[in-house]
Amino acid sequence: MDAFDVIKAPVVTEKTVRMIEEENKLVFYVDRRATKQDIKRAMKELFDVEVEKVNTLITPKGEKKAYVKLKEGYDASKIAASLGIY
């Protein structure tokens, strides 16, 4: 899968903004067929960051969300600012 096909859009809520600031995590809507490895690869390709871990869930609406924790030394708030979340 292409990186642009994997990651669809950032999730922007009060909870996700808190996660960016306190836990160094970003939350995205992703393609339902994307695996955790696909999501890691897409994050590295699109944002040039190293990913520590990826947690995924499928919402009752059928959308897949990915909670992406970045490794030490990478700042989620900088990526969030470039995406227009702040």
Swiss-Prot record:
InterPro entries: Nucleotide-bd_a/b_plait_sf, Ribosomal_uL23, Ribosomal_uL23-like, Ribosomal_uL23/eL15/eS24_sf, Ribosomal_uL23_CS. GO terms for cellular component: cytosolic large ribosomal subunit. Keywords: Ribonucleoprotein, Ribosomal protein, RNA-binding, rRNA-binding. PROSITE patterns: RIBOSOMAL_L23. SUPFAM superfamilies: Ribosomal proteins S24e, L23 and L15e (SSF54189). GO terms for molecular function: rRNA binding; structural constituent of ribosome. GO terms for biological process: translation. The keyword rRNA-binding applies. Belongs to the universal ribosomal protein uL23 family. Binds to 23S rRNA. One of the proteins that surrounds the polypeptide exit tunnel on the outside of the ribosome. Part of the 50S ribosomal subunit. Contacts protein L29. This is Large ribosomal subunit protein uL23. It comes from Methanocaldococcus jannaschii (strain ATCC 43067 / DSM 2661 / JAL-1 / JCM 10045 / NBRC 100440). The gene is rpl23.
